[in-house]
A protein has these predicted regions:
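Outer membrane beta-barrel
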Residues: 3-70, 90, 94-107
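Signature for the C-terminal beta-barrel architecture of outer-membrane proteins
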Residues: 54-171
């Protein structure tokens, strides 16, 4: 087997190139390319795109799992934040198992935990959150065909100020 385990504790992605400026006036999220080294390595294993041709641009990473949501700007900054509010959520740690077994089965498991972020008056801008994804793919006939699955999960530690705005969990 060819399995690799990676872990990071309190990562600093300050050396990563910044995203281009963009003004998005739509109701839809802007998808940027992942550039953080921990998430770039082995990211192909976590790709599970849906409707690649008509609706979704599959080069952006948009699909069932989008790693840029891990460590993003606090979600409740618009509700409770001010100019001094943090621009990103701190990633406390993450671990990843990726690889391919001799029988053609590829596996990717990722788990990441982000810190709780307070705003003015100690209101929650982003609760402590756990992100998880498991992806498996079995190749057939030397890679001519495949069958795969993906399971994603988000679990948040909500408090009274964040509970009306965010889901406790999503799978």
């Amino acid at each position: 087997s060819n399995l690799l385990v990676n872990a990071t504790v309190n990562p600093d992605f300050g050396q990563v190139e910044a995203d281009p400026s963009e003004l998005n006036l739509s109701a839809f999220e802007t998808f940027f390319e992942e550039r953080r080294p921990f998430f770039v390595e082995g990211k192909g294993l976590f790709t599970f795109t849906v409707n690649c041709v008509v609706v979704v641009d599959c080069n952006t990473g948009e699909g069932l799992f989008y790693s840029r949501r891990i460590g993003r700007a606090p979600q409740l900054s618009d509700t409770y934040g001010d100019a001094a509010s943090p621009a990103a959520t701190k990633i406390l740690g993450a671990a990843k198992l990726t690889g391919r077994l001799p029988n053609g089965f590829s596996i990717g498991v990722l788990d990441a935990v982000t810190d709780h972020v307070n705003g003015p008056g100690q209101t929650t801008l982003e609760p402590a959150t756990n992100f998880a994804v498991v992806r498996g793919n079995q190749d057939f006939r030397g890679g001519e065909g495949s069958v795969g699955f993906i399971v994603t999960g988000v679990n948040r530690s909500l408090d009274p100020s964040s509970e009306p705005y965010l889901h406790r969990s999503a799978y």
